[in-house]
Design a protein with these regions (language model features):
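Catalytic cores and adjacent flexible loops of soluble metabolic enzymes
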Residues: 1-187
Length: 187
């Protein structure tokens, strides 16, 4: 997949979209949890993403109790923003009916398996989960394309993640996970 001049020449199919060398830029509208758990807002964000020309929308799929303990300071916020699996499936269908690709970041094995059951075309792995070997193994075993963020990852951790993921169709995202971004952190 590497050309002699050092350019990557691999293309990955995200359902009906090709991503990779010589393909148009693939624009993802990050909805995440910005819907605040409100289906009406989530649907509005899908429509706005479509209107803006985005190729896809991305959500976060999780079970709050598996992410943080109940006494954690962000538990209530995450719980409020959590969308049930049933409603997440409705959002995927809503996006499909509006001709925009949807996918998600699973934060636990159950969420990954649910996303697989609704034919999620690609899995996005958050930077902090690059070291979550159980999640990486689960997602890799599902044989779908993976987008792996590397913002909080050193080279050794990245190599370990790549060994676990194996030969899956993979897109690496280099990002800096500090906000605001100071010039000395930009590379």
């Amino acid at each position: 997949d590497i050309l002699e001049n050092g350019q990557i020449n691999k293309k990955i199919n995200f359902k009906n979209k090709k991503v990779g060398f010589s393909e148009p830029t693939f624009v993802i509208a990050e909805i995440g949890i910005n819907h605040n758990g409100d289906m009406k807002i989530a649907k509005e964000l899908i429509l706005k993403a479509k209107e803006s020309g985005a190729d896809a929308v991305k959500f976060q799929t999780y079970i709050t109790e598996k992410r943080v303990p109940k006494n954690h300071e962000v538990f209530d916020i995450l719980k409020k923003c959590e969308i049930s699996f049933e409603n997440q499936e409705k959002l995927f269908k809503y996006a499909e009916n509006n001709d925009i690709l949807s996918f998600s970041t699973p934060f636990d094995k159950e969420s990954a398996l649910f996303l697989n059951s609704i034919d999620c075309p690609v899995f996005k792995i958050a930077s902090f989960d690059t070291v979550n070997h159980n999640l990486l193994s689960c997602v890799s075993d599902l044989k779908r394309p993976i987008i792996l963020s590397t913002g909080m990852t050193n080279i050794s951790e990245l190599n370990d993640a790549l060994k676990i993921i194996g030969s899956a169709d993979l897109a690496l995202l280099h990002c800096v996970s500090s906000y605001p971004l100071y010039n000395f952190n930009a590379d």
